[in-house]
C-alpha cells in the first residue's frame, strides 16, 4: 500500500513539474486598470478613448473683478 501511494505521488510530481512556456512581457490589459471589470472613477467609457476629455472647469488665472488684477 505504501509503495502504491509513493508511486502515485511520484507520478503526480512529474506531471506537475512539466516545463511551462512563459512570456517575457506583460500585456497592456494587465496594466490598464480601465480595461478590467469595475473600472475606477475617471476612466472613459468604452469607445471614447480617442476623444478629447471634456474639461471639468474653465481655466481661470485666479483673477476676478473684485481683485482688480490685470485681465486678458
UniProtKB/Swiss-Prot annotation:
Pfam families: RALF. One of its GO terms (biological process) is calcium-mediated signaling. Disulfide bonds join 34-43, 63-69. Its main location: secreted. Transmembrane segments: none annotated. One of its GO terms (cellular component) is apoplast. Residues 1-17 form the signal peptide. InterPro entries: RALF. GO terms for molecular function: hormone activity. Residues 37-60 are annotated as: Disordered. Keywords: Disulfide bond, Hormone, Secreted, Signal. Belongs to the plant rapid alkalinization factor (RALF) family. This is Protein RALF-like 12.
Amino acid at each position: 500500500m505504501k509503495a502504491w501511494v509513493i508511486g502515485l505521488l511520484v507520478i503526480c510530481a512529474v506531471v506537475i513539474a512539466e516545463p511551462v512556456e512563459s512570456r517575457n512581457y506583460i500585456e497592456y490589459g494587465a496594466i490598464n486598470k480601465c480595461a478590467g471589470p469595475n473600472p475606477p472613477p475617471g476612466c472613459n467609457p468604452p469607445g471614447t478613448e480617442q476623444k478629447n476629455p471634456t474639461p471639468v472647469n474653465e481655466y481661470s488665472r485666479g483673477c476676478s473683478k473684485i481683485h482688480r488684477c490685470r485681465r486678458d
